[in-house]
Regions:
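Short amphipathic alpha-helical interface segments
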Residues: 1-13, 65-89
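Protein-protein interaction regions
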Residues: 60-62, 94-103, 114-118
Length: 243
């Protein structure tokens, strides 16, 4: 919207523009070698008005707050709003407050963020499935244990819901899935990520085998024994929500 001229986009990525085009925010011309994208004048005017009113700064700020919510829920499963404010303020020069945090995150919850609010907590949205009973269990297990709080850049890596800590044990699991499970690297890493998450929430082995089943992956007798050995190593070296 800042550009006064049409912008060229590689045709290999047209899906990035399709929703905005359907909404009327973009006009796309695919008749040439590159996809030519233009913002209608009316939309451009609205954008520049929002920009003058500080919209881009607010969005950057709210996206950072969302990143902290995503990262801490991914890392801990649940976190109280005061605790999230405390972590944010320790790592940023411009402090936040619960009064700013709640409405900012509510905007992200409204459009499908993987976390939600429960009492004073921000929690993984999956807890809603059983009426948040598992949150209560998690809080009891955590008690007053000190939290592992990475430095800002390391913490915000967890804002990517597919991110997991690369450890020798996870590398061994990925290699096993490729070599014994005959999975391509991309699928092996995806399966490993799902298994790592299952370990974080302390899922049992039956649930982990269900993950393999979702990918139509079967193991024979000797491979099953080797898989259990690899899995025990992963489980013993995974940071749990309850820790």
């Amino acid at each position: 919207a800042r550009s006064r001229e049409p912008v060229k986009v590689k045709k290999a990525l047209p899906e990035q523009c399709s929703l905005l085009e359907d909404l009327g925010y973009l006009v796309c011309d695919a008749s040439q070698e590159d996809l030519i994208v233009t913002v209608p004048t009316e939309i451009s005017k609205v954008f520049h008005q929002l920009e003058r009113e500080g919209y881009t700064e607010r969005k950057t700020r709210y996206d950072l707050l969302d990143g902290y919510a995503m990262a801490t829920v991914h890392l801990y499963g649940a976190i109280s709003q005061p605790d999230l404010v405390d972590i944010f303020n320790r790592q940023n020069s411009q402090p936040t407050s619960e009064e700013e945090l709640f409405p900012a995150l509510l905007r992200h919850v409204a459009v499908g963020a993987p976390y939600c609010f429960w009492e004073e907590y921000i929690v993984c949205g999956e807890f809603e499935e059983n009426g948040f009973e598992d949150v209560r269990d998690l809080m009891r297990q955590c008690g007053g244990k000190p939290r592992y709080i990475p430095e800002k850049d390391d913490l915000l890596r967890y804002a990517d819901w597919n991110y997991y800590e690369r450890t020798p044990q996870m590398d061994a699991l990925t290699a096993f899935l490729m070599n014994e499970g005959h999975q391509p690297r991309r699928d092996a890493e995806e399966i490993a990520g799902e298994i790592q998450y299952a370990c974080v929430i302390e899922a049992d082995m039956e649930q982990i085998y269900d993950i393999l089943g979702d990918y139509d992956m079967e193991l024979d007798g000797s491979a099953v024994e080797a898989f259990v050995k690899v899995m025990m190593s992963v489980k013993n070296n995974t940071r749990l929500w309850a820790n």
